[in-house]
Amino acid sequence: MVKSAASQSPSPVTITVTPCKGSGDRSLGLTSPIPRASVITNQNSPLSSRATRRTSISSGNRRSNGDEGRYCSMSVEDLTAETTNSECVLSYTVHIPPTPDHQTVFASQESEEDEMLKGNSNQKSFLSGTIFTGGFKSVTRGHVIDCSMDRADPEKKSGQICWLKGCDEKVVHGRCECGFRICRDCYFDCITSGGGNCPGCKEPYRDINDDPETEEEDEEDEAKPLPQMGESKLDKRLSVVKSFKAQNQAGDFDHTRWLFETKGTYGYGNAVWPKDGYGIGSGGGGNGYETPPEFGERSKRPLTRKVSVSAAIISPYRLLIALRLVALGLFLTWRVRHPNREAMWLWGMSTTCELWFALSWLLDQLPKLCPVNRLTDLGVLKERFESPNLRNPKGRSDLPGIDVFVSTADPEKEPPLVTANTILSILAVDYPVEKLACYLSDDGGALLTFEALAQTASFASTWVPFCRKHNIEPRNPEAYFGQKRNFLKNKVRLDFVRERRRVKREYDEFKVRINSLPEAIRRRSDAYNVHEELRAKKKQMEMMMGNNPQETVIVPKATWMSDGSHWPGTWSSGETDNSRGDHAGIIQAMLAPPNAEPVYGAEADAENLIDTTDVDIRLPMLVYVSREKRPGYDHNKKAGAMNALVRTSAIMSNGPFILNLDCDHYIYNSMALREGMCFMLDRGGDRICYVQFPQRFEGIDPNDRYANHNTVFFDVSMRALDGLQGPMYVGTGCIFRRTALYGFSPPRATEHHGWLGRRKVKISLRRPKAMMKKDDEVSLPINGEYNEEENDDGDIESLLLPKRFGNSNSFVASIPVAEYQGRLIQDLQGKGKNSRPAGSLAVPREPLDAATVAEAISVISCFYEDKTEWGKRVGWIYGSVTEDVVTGYRMHNRGWRSIYCVTKRDAFRGTAPINLTDRLHQVLRWATGSVEIFFSRNNAIFATRRMKFLQRVAYFNVGMYPFTSLFLIVYCILPAISLFSGQFIVQSLDITFLIYLLSITLTLCMLSLLEIKWSGITLHEWWRNEQFWVIGGTSAHPAAVLQGLLKVIAGVDISFTLTSKSSAPEDGDDEFADLYVVKWSFLMVPPLTIMMVNMIAIAVGLARTLYSPFPQWSKLVGGVFFSFWVLCHLYPFAKGLMGRRGRVPTIVFVWSGLLSIIVSLLWVYINPPSGKQDYMQFQFP
């Protein structure tokens, strides 16, 4: 259909000329069934492949009888058949001229653009009100409900009503370039009686639709890719002067360097820069015609900088490591050559333990030789990707999309309010709204989580604009309103206090609604179940014709949604097909994808709590996902849930980058995503597989009794690994490159050959190899290679795709799109390299339709991963309870690099278990995963040559550190054995032994001080880490070794309970109440035994020495010193057993004292000291 830009369309009439069958054109719900137009003109671009792979749901699939409690079957096969068999009509529009019986109404008929927007709006409302379910042996169904929780009218929320006071008519479209919204009647009033001036800018109206340049400007807004500068033809009418600098010849067109030639001196407007440079910079180099100033120099600056640790700190640090290594070698040599002949067994055990400790220290210390710091420049990021340029005249965001994954499994242990606050912080993050999508994985399939997310989506319409308007930090409402500081600091808007009070009141009501959901769901389900039971009994009585029924009616105790239909997920009664491990897959788009253009709100009124007239009120897409679970299928815990999210997001939004967060880790710094993208989009960023942020925790007791902050690991070890090949993946707070998760290799890698990998060989991994071994990693093909490569390599690669990724064609088609969108722009990579043109992502996202969601249902089915490589080489890796470490190891093993991003303001914050038992179980799970890694093919011993040597040492230490606990337990008991037996690990305290011991201790202390210096941690944090290393090494780590050996040898499966997340304390409650709760566990037995044995041994040793006529004080001092060293490390454990301060059970001290006295007297009686006297004799009566 051809449309003129200047013609009016008051009454178009569509005339059907010829019907045709099987054309395959797709209906958009408009008057003319034209095929969808794509804004991408490059047919070879992967961005055009997604438009051809989608199918849509016809409007006839949705029932029009208003029966919302019914299921409407919409299988993928039906959708495909319906789409391909749809009729295509050739139509054109006849414009009827105005007549007396047909008056022209200027704005009564909506334009085609408005019709399309209306269709998209209806599609969004349909998607956000429909639950899609499906799975094994069941068709995909769309259950239409109202899940908006009384959400406000989007037209009124978005300000689509007249802005003149007293008028609430709908705005047809803007009549003035200032953007002032006005309805048809008010517009006519302004034209007739208002002098024809706009009420907003007071300028005369000009009909925008009559402007012949409007259509051309709309075409420019599409930001189409331009041809290369070498192929473009310059205007012959212009005389230009071209710079000969090599660095600008491959870049974008620069307006400041191609200007009209003139002889006048008008500042920077001249095309010819004089030789004297106008007196600027003429001192050196001879700035003449060839070196005009670099006006775009800021945009060419790097996004990141690597800052090495000062040489005044790192050089002595490395020297001390070498000195301590020499001292350890001399000490161990002396120990081996000078055995204790009087107690060889004691000498042998101690020497073996010391040798192992030396090896463990060396493996832990070597990866710390090259620590680095990194800085980002957000100003350059904004200028490069969000500023107007030739390919992006409107300055739309050219940043790639990010899909945020939030995982939860049990609403009882992970409170819905905590998850809701995390979701709110994500929705309010400072990142382009249209480029962001949030996915919540509910692995428990609980209705409580579903309805809590619906409530969160409703409250987000108030919270997110409030954060954007007043620049709120942090954007977690619970954390923000709970801050104990002056909230007026740096706030300049006059309405801030009033609006903060309103939002705070609304949030308190939101918390009440969330906390009352469990009881509301229970009461609702009980009422519906009673009603169903009565109906069943009534039906039975009617069938029995009034006779007494002999069989009891059994009605399943279902869980009911608010619209009176069964919840397709987990029921509280745990019925078949509706239990925690047996339920259908569920997808619900709570918030549909936003429009590409900003939508501004309205003034504060009864429905709008805050004034949002100048605030973008769009919200990112929010999706609820619960993968299908069936008996007989291994669901692989969290790793399986994350892989289901990877496939779902690839079909629905396909962001080239993925952020993974736990449900209790919220975004504390709204700029965190931008800082992470600086590394991904900078030069060399195509080799980065993920950007890991440090974990920071809230709710920890001020003394950090159990080293919950873990700063030694996050600020020392991880920062040091950043100087090698990159930090490890720790399970949350990590931005991934999607193609790296798919198991592809980086575009370039370095292999390390020779002794300790000192000889480097750079290789290119872009092209796939025809001959690949079974265990070889997959190389990433160039765009279009799947379908257009004519050689055998491309055919082999295409045949392997279903085996690797599954049988979803939509998912496979999304892979090259994600790879293309994640590329670097040509300014950094160059024309001939694998890059994308600037502005290629500044285009609107394709609308989400129901057929796409139906396809997403199929990829979360329980059988989709069968006979594929998901969990083996693709996605999160299965087979270990610490799937995060294994996943990061696989990426580094392929040659990828990772980055550690430490921001000035913490990027993310979460919670950690402060209870002793919970903390020990958390450490037990980590250590068990390490043992599994040690006995698997993921052991760093079998790493490829693409992994650096020191990086391999770090990964090997991850798998080996739990075995240190066996030697640590023995070494902690040795002082007690020494005191009991009267012997020591050395025959005598020789001066050489003391010198070696002193040198080892001093070098360790100096190393610790230097680590504190370059990492920024405190001495208190370092000491707490040392204490908990002993506590964990004597409790959780040996249990992990035992469990790991049972799994490897006997095949015993290991299962762990989910770590409970504490919710926010109410007013008046003790924030650290859980710290003093004593929960008994078998893990407490070994350290408790060590403590009691050492205390008794000290008493026995003192008694023997005091009563001996020939006391050996040297052995006593050595034994007591080492026993005291053990007890000092176990002091936090003992304090945790005592409970709350001031409430220490007296019986503990009484029995401990009595037991120590009795054991001491019994030892003296059984083994009396030599030379005893009669008055020292003790006899039982």
Swiss-Prot record:
Could you list the residue ranges forming a coiled coil in this record?
Answer: 497-542
Keyword Disulfide bond (UniProt)? no
Per UniProt, what is the name of the gene that codes for the protein in this document?
CSLD5
Protein name as annotated:
Cellulose synthase-like protein D5
Acidic residues: bias regions: 210-222
Q: In which tissues is it expressed?
A: Expressed in vascular tissues.
* InterPro entries (UniProt xref): Cellulose_synth, Nucleotide-diphossugar_trans, Znf_RING/FYVE/PHD
Enumerate the residue ranges of region (Disordered).
1-70, 202-229
